[in-house]
């Protein structure tokens, strides 16, 4: 009994190791297949770019070009069609004739130039990040611009003195108006003072009458 017990667990141990080896072989085989050549989309774009036909490259002509490049067209026929559809949807290829994978295809010049532009944009974006930091500095300048707001507030205070000055000016005309009536009563007072001067000759008459009384006394 003791001899048979260790033999039973020893049997499943190699059974567990074998699937690990199979998985490793499958992953190595998949890696070899992927590394065997470039993807279908790159081969299609190269074949379409190499053609000089203005109307575009047909599917049959494209397959011939791929076969000449050493690509197995018969086995990968479905991949070629899927690659064409994906390139058309992305905009790298333009379908001039037909629908789907069948028809004629032409390289999109805008997309070809656009592929080179993103690289330049990335380099430009890295440079643009530094000016972004410089753009933050003007924000500090906006903080310095806040005194302008306070400067705008001060004129409001200046307006109040101006209004007060206007009020004082408005008050001063009242004083001037009051001064005019004061001068007016003075002039009649002078006129009254002139009248008594004219009345003095009247008082001289009684003085002339006094000698008459003296003459009467002498009598």
UniProtKB/Swiss-Prot annotation:
Extra facts: This variant accounts for 60% of histone H1.
Signal peptide: none
GO annotation, biological process: chromosome condensation; negative regulation of DNA recombination; negative regulation of transcription by RNA polymerase II; nucleosome assembly
Protein family: Belongs to the histone H1/H5 family.
DNA-binding is among the record's keywords: yes
Lineage: Eukaryota, Metazoa, Chordata, Craniata, Vertebrata
Region feature (Disordered): 1-41, 92-219
Comment field on protein domains: The C-terminal domain is required for high-affinity binding to chromatin.
Pathological condition linked to this protein in its record: Rahman syndrome: An autosomal dominant syndrome characterized by intellectual disability and overgrowth manifesting as increased birth length, height, weight, and/or head circumference.
Phosphothreonine found at: 18, 146
Keyword terms of this UniProt record: Acetylation, ADP-ribosylation, Chromosome, Citrullination, DNA-binding, Hydroxylation, Intellectual disability, Methylation, Nucleus, Phosphoprotein
Protein name, per record: Histone H1.4
Residue numbers bearing the N-acetylserine modification: 2
PROSITE patterns: H15
Residues recorded with modification N6-methyllysine: 26
Cross-referenced SUPFAM superfamilies: Winged helix' DNA-binding domain
Post-translational modification: H1 histones are progressively phosphorylated during the cell cycle, becoming maximally phosphorylated during late G2 phase and M phase, and being dephosphorylated sharply thereafter. Acetylated at Lys-26. Deacetylated at Lys-26 by SIRT1.
Residues modified to N6-(beta-hydroxybutyryl)lysine: 34, 52, 64, 85, 90, 106
InterPro entries xref list: H1/H5 (IPR005819), Histone_H1/H5_H15 (IPR005818), WH-like_DNA-bd_sf (IPR036388), WH_DNA-bd_sf (IPR036390)
Subcellular location as annotated: Nucleus; Chromosome
Modified residues (N6-succinyllysine): 34
Transmembrane regions listed in the UniProt entry: none
Summary of the function given for this chain in its UniProt record: Histone H1 protein binds to linker DNA between nucleosomes forming the macromolecular structure known as the chromatin fiber. Histones H1 are necessary for the condensation of nucleosome chains into higher-order structured fibers. Also acts as a regulator of individual gene transcription through chromatin remodeling, nucleosome spacing and DNA methylation.
Residues with the Citrulline modification: 54
Modification sites for ADP-ribosylserine: 150
Gene3D superfamilies xref list: Winged helix-like DNA-binding domain superfamily/Winged helix DNA-binding domain
């Amino acid at each position: 009994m003791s001899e048979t017990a260790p033999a039973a667990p020893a049997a499943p141990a190699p059974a567990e190791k074998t699937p690990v080896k199979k998985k490793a072989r499958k992953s190595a085989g998949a890696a070899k297949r992927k590394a065997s050549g470039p993807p279908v989309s790159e081969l299609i774009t190269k074949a379409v770019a190499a053609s000089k036909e203005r109307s575009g490259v047909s599917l049959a002509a494209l397959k011939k070009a791929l076969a000449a490049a050493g690509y197995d067209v018969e086995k990968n026929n479905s991949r070629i069609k899927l690659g064409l559809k994906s390139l058309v949807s992305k905009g790298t290829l333009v379908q001039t004739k037909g629908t789907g994978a069948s028809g004629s295809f032409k390289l999109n010049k805008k997309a070809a130039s656009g592929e080179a532009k993103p690289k330049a944009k990335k380099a430009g974006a890295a440079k643009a990040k530094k000016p972004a930091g410089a753009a933050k500095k003007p924000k500090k300048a906006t903080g310095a611009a806040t005194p302008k707001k306070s400067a705008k507030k001060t004129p409001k205070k200046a307006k109040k003195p101006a209004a007060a000055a206007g009020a004082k000016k408005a008050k001063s005309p009242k004083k001037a108006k009051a001064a005019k009536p004061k001068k007016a009563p003075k002039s009649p007072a002078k006129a009254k003072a002139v009248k008594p001067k004219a009345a003095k000759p009247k008082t001289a008459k009684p003085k002339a009458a006094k000698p008459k009384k003296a003459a009467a006394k002498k009598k």
